[in-house]
């Protein structure tokens, strides 16, 4: 399995190895959807049986390029009935021809994070991305430098739709906003632990790009003033937040393993769903929490760490993460702004 961290942990792979003695089970974790997809394009379609990436790629690239294959609806559709309401008929799990091409599991709203002792949740949700353009916030925030996400979030801050082409005057607007966001930041780092530490010790009051995934370890350690925020409104159909949802799909390996779909079924089990949610030092909700058998495995502190109290509401205010339309041009502008 080629995956985001979590599926490669001993808590997940150990029990599967025990259940399948004699099988060789190998997992490699990546930190970029495009990089993982490029491995398949470069010939590693012969190596992997499953791929776990965020929601737009299966339908937009992997399936049209024959890098993944349909899953058995008879075998896997019943699992959707046990998921949270927002996943019961999740459109990005299906190709345009109606085939089932991936199963959702981990997910989370991903916009920005504040210290609620300094900026109230209500104010942060109300201000949305404008918070970072406020002159009083100069040098009081950090930027978590996940470049693809920064590009999306700068578009939203500039009042633009990242999933439509950004050209002409809109591109100028993106450039100005990128320069302001990067120029007025106190800290630029891709280390979420360092960012949470700076937030807790008062070095910054908020950070641009972040969410449940990055706030949860600090919250689980007791710093519940670290909170992921989803704006109440925004420039795309009234929405300003973005949500990522991982889909796990079967690679179109010419010499497939019959254990691939067994593993996909295995991670739906309550105790394995819980292990996927809480592993490797970041904690995330999973779609399987629609089942009482899964939900009952989480205690109050764990649910608080992943902000379960507001998740459904935040999801409703978020756009699905999609492929950024003008990515090549925008990443170039963004990189210059970041370096200067």
Predicted segment positions?
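Hinge/lid segment of periplasmic solute-binding proteins
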Residues: 37, 56, 60-107, 122-125, ...
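Early extracytoplasmic/lumenal segment of secretory-pathway proteins
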Residues: 1-61
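Ligand-binding pocket segment of bilobal, Venus flytrap-like solute-binding proteins
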Residues: 140-155, 162-231
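Conserved C-terminal helix/tail region of periplasmic/extracytoplasmic solute-binding proteins
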Residues: 305-340
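Short beta-strand->loop
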Residues: 2-5, 69-80, 97-107, 114-117, 121-123, 224-242, 251-252, ...
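Short helices/loops that flank or line small-molecule/ion binding pockets
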Residues: 14, 36-48, 63-65, 131, ...
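Mature extracytoplasmic/periplasmic domains
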Residues: 246-314
